[in-house]
């Protein structure tokens, strides 16, 4: 007889939202005074992991950064504001969306500079995958992101299968 795992109570999107603020310093930049892309990716990974952890309430590891758009340069002295939102929870993995803005410290204006989607996997102390709670969507925006995350996951799975078949044939 197969054992059935007890259902985990759902958690709301709002419960895992995260925000992080960082001042861009000269050590974070290239010789032109622009923020290094790798440094921005590091911040994106951190704020995404915080949202995933808040949802799963256990250790999480980054499985992929599926898509990242660098929209505009970020300069030394800019204030980075990174916001992450859990888009969807699957069995042991979660998709998190991250948006990055720059607040100009002189006039307070905001500019969208980057966006990314990341997948995190919940694990125990031994690194074994563990189930995550389902995600409870409340707003139309939550529902749209939930649906879009499912579509992106299907596309990623098809792409992985295509690559496996292409590799097996070579």
Question: Which role does the model predict for each range below?
Answer:
Residues 65-68:
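Short alpha-helix capping/helix-loop boundary micro-motifs
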